[in-house]
Regions:
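Generic N-terminal amphipathic, Lys/Arg-enriched alpha-helix
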Residues: 1-13
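A short alpha/beta connector and helix-capping loop motif
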Residues: 14-41, 46
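Active-site-adjacent betaalpha module
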Residues: 35, 47-192
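Structural beta-sheet core signal
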Residues: 2-4, 39-41, 98, 122
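Short hydrophobic/aromatic-rich motifs at helix boundaries and adjacent loops
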Residues: 1-2, 23-27, 109-113
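Amphipathic, alpha-helical segments enriched in basic
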Residues: 7, 27-31, 117, 146
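A generic structural signal for short coil/turn motifs at secondary-structure boundaries
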Residues: 12-15, 130
Length: 192
């Protein structure tokens, strides 16, 4: 039996440009902390496929604290346990940002958030699949179904809305820090 770390490393090497997905996700998570955006995470069959990547720092003592970090077998992330935690924030419709793998399976099946009336952003430089060719097909479907397919930087500036907010300087600093990685991530993951 493979250890969770070995399973993660094997899975990591199978995903097209996986380190770039992680890099963009790290940028978004850091900005989420500054902007007080709640974070929800899921892991697909933790016992079989391993833990969510440790470098994201999810629920680590000095890391990103999630509202819920749920293990699941369903392909959508919007499983009952996560849905319960999500609606503990209130019943109003929300804007939801989706990142992760695999774009044509778990990311696409999270369209059920749209059916619940939420606005869904899929971050093109933070999703991928084992087969790179699946990604543009999945993003086209997501867009056709009503999701906003955008980039991490575009989303962050839309989220802030105004350079006059107190968090602007901190988020702009994160964007600047990740500038080179963002350019490389876009070149690798956003071939439309």
């Amino acid at each position: 039996m493979a250890t969770p770390t070995r399973r993660l490393e094997k899975f990591r090497s199978a995903i097209h440009e996986f380190p770039r997905v992680v890099s963009t996700t790290q940028k978004l998570l850091r900005a989420a902390q500054l902007l007080d955006i709640p974070v929800f995470a899921t892991t697909q069959l933790r016992d079989k496929l391993g833990e969510t990547c440790p470098e994201l720092g999810l629920d680590a003592p000095d890391g990103i604290q999630t509202k819920a970090h749920v293990d699941k077998s369903a392909f959508s992330m919007f499983v009952p346990e996560l849905k319960k935690a999500f609606y503990e924030l209130g019943e109003e419709k929300r804007e939801v940002v989706v990142v992760g793998i695999e774009s044509h399976i778990c990311v696409t099946q999270t369209l059920d958030l749209l059916r619940e009336g939420h606005k869904v952003y899929v971050i093109a430089d933070a999703v991928s699949s084992c087969n790179a060719q699946e990604v543009p097909v999945a993003l086209a479907r997501l867009r056709a179904e009503g999701a906003v397919v955008t980039t991490s930087e575009s989303f962050l500036y839309e989220c802030m809305g105004d350079a006059g907010i107190k968090e602007f300087k901190g988020v702009a600093g994160i964007v600047k820090e990740f500038n080179k990685a963002t350019r490389e991530n876009l070149e690798a993951l956003c071939k439309m």
